[in-house]
Protein backbone atom coordinates (compact mmCIF):
# COMPACT_ATOMS: atom_id res chain seq x y z
CA UNK A 1 0.00 0.00 0.00
CA UNK A 2 2.85 2.38 0.91
CA UNK A 3 4.49 1.69 -2.45
CA UNK A 4 1.24 2.44 -4.28
CA UNK A 5 0.77 5.68 -2.33
CA UNK A 6 4.38 6.70 -2.96
CA UNK A 7 3.95 5.96 -6.66
CA UNK A 8 0.81 8.11 -6.86
CA UNK A 9 2.52 10.93 -4.98
CA UNK A 10 5.48 10.88 -7.34
CA UNK A 11 3.12 10.89 -10.33
CA UNK A 12 1.26 13.94 -8.99
CA UNK A 13 4.53 15.76 -8.32
CA UNK A 14 5.74 14.89 -11.82
CA UNK A 15 2.53 16.17 -13.45
CA UNK A 16 2.68 19.35 -11.40
CA UNK A 17 6.27 19.94 -12.43
CA UNK A 18 5.37 19.35 -16.09
CA UNK A 19 2.45 21.78 -15.83
CA UNK A 20 4.71 24.44 -14.35
CA UNK A 21 7.26 23.79 -17.08
CA UNK A 22 4.56 24.09 -19.77
CA UNK A 23 3.37 27.37 -18.25
CA UNK A 24 6.91 28.71 -18.30
CA UNK A 25 7.38 27.47 -21.87
CA UNK A 26 4.13 29.14 -22.99
CA UNK A 27 5.24 32.38 -21.35
CA UNK A 28 8.64 32.19 -23.02
CA UNK A 29 7.02 31.31 -26.34
CA UNK A 30 4.78 34.36 -25.99
CA UNK A 31 7.75 36.64 -25.42
CA UNK A 32 9.84 35.11 -28.18
CA UNK A 33 6.95 35.21 -30.66
CA UNK A 34 6.19 38.79 -29.69
CA UNK A 35 9.76 39.84 -30.42
CA UNK A 36 9.85 37.90 -33.68
CA UNK A 37 6.58 39.32 -35.02
CA UNK A 38 7.35 42.85 -33.89
CA UNK A 39 10.74 42.77 -35.61
CA UNK A 40 9.18 41.47 -38.83
CA UNK A 41 6.52 44.18 -38.79
CA UNK A 42 8.35 47.23 -37.52
CA UNK A 43 12.03 46.35 -37.75
CA UNK A 44 12.65 47.28 -34.12
CA UNK A 45 12.89 45.60 -30.76
CA UNK A 46 9.79 44.87 -28.71
CA UNK A 47 9.66 44.96 -24.91
CA UNK A 48 12.57 47.38 -24.69
CA UNK A 49 11.26 49.27 -21.64
CA UNK A 50 11.64 52.64 -23.34
CA UNK A 51 9.21 55.54 -23.65
CA UNK A 52 6.87 57.24 -21.18
CA UNK A 53 4.59 54.22 -20.66
CA UNK A 54 6.70 51.07 -20.91
CA UNK A 55 4.28 49.01 -18.81
CA UNK A 56 1.29 49.34 -21.11
CA UNK A 57 3.53 48.85 -24.14
CA UNK A 58 4.82 45.64 -22.56
CA UNK A 59 1.26 44.40 -21.98
CA UNK A 60 -0.05 45.27 -25.44
CA UNK A 61 2.96 43.96 -27.33
CA UNK A 62 2.91 40.58 -25.59
CA UNK A 63 -0.86 40.33 -26.04
CA UNK A 64 -1.02 41.37 -29.70
CA UNK A 65 2.18 40.00 -31.17
CA UNK A 66 2.71 37.07 -28.80
CA UNK A 67 -0.85 35.78 -28.32
CA UNK A 68 -3.34 37.16 -30.84
CA UNK A 69 -0.91 36.56 -33.70
CA UNK A 70 -0.82 32.83 -32.97
CA UNK A 71 -4.60 32.45 -32.59
CA UNK A 72 -6.17 30.94 -35.69
CA UNK A 73 -4.82 30.21 -39.13
CA UNK A 74 -4.21 33.65 -40.65
CA UNK A 75 -1.01 34.62 -42.40
CA UNK A 76 0.78 37.73 -41.23
CA UNK A 77 -0.16 39.69 -44.38
CA UNK A 78 -3.86 39.14 -43.78
CA UNK A 79 -3.48 40.03 -40.11
CA UNK A 80 -1.86 43.34 -40.99
CA UNK A 81 -4.50 44.19 -43.61
CA UNK A 82 -7.16 43.52 -40.96
CA UNK A 83 -5.35 45.81 -38.54
CA UNK A 84 -5.19 48.55 -41.17
CA UNK A 85 -8.92 48.42 -41.97
CA UNK A 86 -9.72 48.51 -38.24
CA UNK A 87 -7.58 51.61 -37.78
CA UNK A 88 -9.03 53.24 -40.91
CA UNK A 89 -12.56 52.59 -39.66
CA UNK A 90 -11.75 54.11 -36.26
CA UNK A 91 -9.81 56.98 -37.91
CA UNK A 92 -6.73 56.25 -35.83
CA UNK A 93 -4.56 57.82 -38.52
CA UNK A 94 -1.12 58.00 -36.84
CA UNK A 95 -1.35 54.30 -35.98
CA UNK A 96 -2.64 53.53 -39.48
CA UNK A 97 0.42 55.13 -41.04
CA UNK A 98 2.70 53.03 -38.83
CA UNK A 99 0.84 49.86 -39.67
CA UNK A 100 0.86 50.71 -43.39
CA UNK A 101 4.64 50.56 -43.18
CA UNK A 102 4.42 47.32 -41.22
CA UNK A 103 2.14 45.87 -43.88
CA UNK A 104 4.75 46.60 -46.56
CA UNK A 105 7.42 44.99 -44.39
CA UNK A 106 5.55 41.66 -44.30
CA UNK A 107 4.72 41.54 -48.00
CA UNK A 108 1.43 43.40 -48.46
CA UNK A 109 1.65 45.14 -51.83
CA UNK A 110 0.68 48.79 -52.30
CA UNK A 111 -2.26 47.68 -54.46
CA UNK A 112 -3.47 45.23 -51.80
CA UNK A 113 -3.29 47.85 -49.06
CA UNK A 114 -5.03 50.50 -51.12
CA UNK A 115 -7.79 48.05 -52.08
CA UNK A 116 -8.24 47.03 -48.44
CA UNK A 117 -8.82 50.68 -47.49
CA UNK A 118 -11.06 51.35 -50.51
CA UNK A 119 -13.16 48.32 -49.53
CA UNK A 120 -14.19 50.19 -46.38
CA UNK A 121 -15.89 53.02 -48.30
CA UNK A 122 -19.41 51.58 -48.65
CA UNK A 123 -19.43 50.79 -44.92
CA UNK A 124 -17.79 53.80 -43.26
CA UNK A 125 -18.33 56.47 -45.93
CA UNK A 126 -16.03 58.27 -48.32
CA UNK A 127 -14.67 61.03 -46.00
CA UNK A 128 -13.10 58.50 -43.63
CA UNK A 129 -11.57 56.57 -46.51
CA UNK A 130 -10.11 59.78 -47.95
CA UNK A 131 -8.62 60.58 -44.53
CA UNK A 132 -7.16 57.09 -44.31
CA UNK A 133 -5.73 57.25 -47.81
CA UNK A 134 -4.01 60.54 -46.98
CA UNK A 135 -1.74 58.82 -44.45
CA UNK A 136 -1.43 55.63 -46.51
CA UNK A 137 -0.29 57.73 -49.48
CA UNK A 138 2.24 59.42 -47.19
CA UNK A 139 3.55 55.96 -46.33
CA UNK A 140 3.71 55.15 -50.05
CA UNK A 141 5.64 58.34 -50.84
CA UNK A 142 8.11 57.77 -48.02
CA UNK A 143 8.84 54.36 -49.53
CA UNK A 144 9.39 55.85 -52.98
CA UNK A 145 6.11 54.45 -54.29
CA UNK A 146 4.60 56.71 -56.94
CA UNK A 147 0.94 57.64 -56.56
CA UNK A 148 -1.65 57.35 -57.94
CA UNK A 149 -1.29 53.61 -58.20
CA UNK A 150 -2.44 51.69 -61.25
CA UNK A 151 -6.21 51.49 -61.66
CA UNK A 152 -7.87 48.25 -60.58
CA UNK A 153 -11.33 49.07 -61.96
CA UNK A 154 -12.91 46.35 -64.11
CA UNK A 155 -16.38 47.76 -64.84
CA UNK A 156 -17.86 50.45 -67.06
CA UNK A 157 -20.80 52.81 -66.67
CA UNK A 158 -22.81 50.41 -68.78
CA UNK A 159 -22.10 47.17 -66.89
CA UNK A 160 -21.41 48.15 -63.26
CA UNK A 161 -24.89 47.11 -62.11
CA UNK A 162 -24.76 43.81 -63.99
CA UNK A 163 -21.25 42.95 -62.79
CA UNK A 164 -22.07 43.99 -59.26
CA UNK A 165 -25.20 41.85 -59.24
CA UNK A 166 -23.17 38.86 -60.46
CA UNK A 167 -21.16 39.03 -57.23
CA UNK A 168 -23.94 40.17 -54.91
CA UNK A 169 -26.70 37.70 -55.77
CA UNK A 170 -24.85 34.40 -55.05
CA UNK A 171 -23.71 35.77 -51.68
CA UNK A 172 -26.73 37.78 -50.52
CA UNK A 173 -29.64 37.11 -52.85
CA UNK A 174 -32.17 39.95 -53.26
CA UNK A 175 -32.76 40.50 -49.54
CA UNK A 176 -31.92 44.21 -49.60
CA UNK A 177 -34.19 44.91 -52.56
CA UNK A 178 -37.03 43.16 -50.75
CA UNK A 179 -36.29 44.86 -47.43
CA UNK A 180 -36.30 48.34 -48.99
CA UNK A 181 -39.34 47.98 -51.24
CA UNK A 182 -41.68 49.90 -48.91
CA UNK A 183 -39.40 52.90 -48.33
CA UNK A 184 -41.51 56.05 -48.98
CA UNK A 185 -41.59 57.53 -52.45
CA UNK A 186 -40.35 54.36 -54.09
CA UNK A 187 -36.81 55.42 -53.22
CA UNK A 188 -35.96 52.10 -51.61
CA UNK A 189 -35.52 50.64 -55.07
CA UNK A 190 -32.99 53.36 -55.87
CA UNK A 191 -31.08 52.66 -52.65
CA UNK A 192 -30.99 48.93 -53.41
CA UNK A 193 -29.64 49.76 -56.86
CA UNK A 194 -27.02 52.10 -55.36
CA UNK A 195 -25.89 49.25 -53.11
CA UNK A 196 -25.47 46.89 -56.05
CA UNK A 197 -23.75 49.45 -58.24
CA UNK A 198 -21.45 51.02 -55.65
CA UNK A 199 -20.62 48.35 -53.07
CA UNK A 200 -20.44 45.50 -55.55
CA UNK A 201 -20.12 47.09 -59.00
CA UNK A 202 -17.60 49.81 -58.15
CA UNK A 203 -15.66 48.13 -55.33
CA UNK A 204 -16.16 44.38 -55.06
CA UNK A 205 -15.39 43.88 -58.76
CA UNK A 206 -11.99 45.55 -58.53
CA UNK A 207 -8.75 43.65 -59.05
CA UNK A 208 -6.08 43.49 -56.37
CA UNK A 209 -8.01 41.47 -53.79
CA UNK A 210 -10.19 38.43 -54.32
CA UNK A 211 -13.79 38.11 -53.14
CA UNK A 212 -13.05 35.98 -50.02
CA UNK A 213 -10.50 38.55 -48.82
CA UNK A 214 -12.84 41.45 -49.49
CA UNK A 215 -15.65 39.72 -47.60
CA UNK A 216 -13.34 38.97 -44.67
CA UNK A 217 -12.18 42.58 -44.46
CA UNK A 218 -15.76 43.81 -44.74
CA UNK A 219 -16.72 41.60 -41.80
CA UNK A 220 -13.94 43.18 -39.77
CA UNK A 221 -15.15 46.69 -40.63
CA UNK A 222 -18.70 45.75 -39.60
CA UNK A 223 -17.28 44.29 -36.37
CA UNK A 224 -15.63 47.61 -35.56
CA UNK A 225 -18.86 49.60 -35.98
CA UNK A 226 -21.03 46.92 -34.34
CA UNK A 227 -23.51 46.64 -37.23
CA UNK A 228 -25.38 43.61 -35.90
CA UNK A 229 -27.90 42.92 -38.72
CA UNK A 230 -25.17 43.25 -41.33
CA UNK A 231 -22.84 41.01 -39.32
CA UNK A 232 -25.37 38.19 -39.64
CA UNK A 233 -25.75 38.66 -43.40
CA UNK A 234 -22.04 39.08 -44.03
CA UNK A 235 -21.15 36.03 -41.95
CA UNK A 236 -23.34 33.94 -44.23
CA UNK A 237 -21.76 35.63 -47.25
CA UNK A 238 -18.26 34.88 -45.95
CA UNK A 239 -19.11 31.20 -45.68
CA UNK A 240 -20.53 31.19 -49.22
CA UNK A 241 -17.41 32.97 -50.47
CA UNK A 242 -15.24 30.18 -49.05
CA UNK A 243 -14.08 31.56 -45.71
CA UNK A 244 -14.44 29.01 -42.92
CA UNK A 245 -16.04 29.90 -39.56
CA UNK A 246 -12.61 29.43 -38.00
CA UNK A 247 -11.03 31.94 -40.38
CA UNK A 248 -13.69 34.58 -39.72
CA UNK A 249 -13.33 33.94 -35.98
CA UNK A 250 -9.57 34.44 -36.17
CA UNK A 251 -10.14 37.68 -38.11
CA UNK A 252 -12.43 39.03 -35.38
CA UNK A 253 -9.88 38.08 -32.72
CA UNK A 254 -7.26 39.96 -34.73
CA UNK A 255 -9.48 43.05 -34.41
CA UNK A 256 -9.90 42.60 -30.65
CA UNK A 257 -6.86 44.49 -29.31
CA UNK A 258 -7.76 47.53 -31.42
CA UNK A 259 -11.54 47.66 -30.87
CA UNK A 260 -11.85 46.16 -27.37
CA UNK A 261 -13.55 43.04 -26.08
CA UNK A 262 -17.25 44.12 -26.19
CA UNK A 263 -17.40 44.80 -29.94
CA UNK A 264 -15.39 41.68 -30.75
CA UNK A 265 -17.52 39.49 -28.47
CA UNK A 266 -20.68 40.69 -30.23
CA UNK A 267 -19.26 39.54 -33.58
CA UNK A 268 -18.00 36.25 -32.12
CA UNK A 269 -21.43 35.47 -30.68
CA UNK A 270 -23.00 36.11 -34.09
CA UNK A 271 -20.53 33.69 -35.69
CA UNK A 272 -21.38 31.11 -33.03
CA UNK A 273 -25.14 31.58 -33.45
CA UNK A 274 -25.05 31.48 -37.25
CA UNK A 275 -22.87 28.38 -37.42
CA UNK A 276 -24.99 26.50 -34.86
CA UNK A 277 -28.18 26.91 -36.89
Q: Which residues make up each language-model segment?
A:
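Alpha-helical transition-metal enzyme core signature, strongest for iron centers
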Residues: 89-93, 123-126, 224, 255-261
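Short, structured motif recognition centered on aromatic/hydrophobic residues
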Residues: 78-87, 116-117, 213-222, 251-255
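Bacterial Sec-dependent N-terminal signal peptides
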Residues: 1-22
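Electropositive phosphate-/nucleotide-binding environments in soluble metabolic enzymes
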Residues: 28, 32, 54, 93, ...
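Short, glycine/charged-rich beta-strand-loop motifs at protein surfaces that mediate ligand recognition
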Residues: 206-207, 220-225
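Extended intrinsically disordered, low-complexity coil regions enriched in Ser, Thr, Gly, Ala
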Residues: 75, 91-114, 118, 128-141, ...
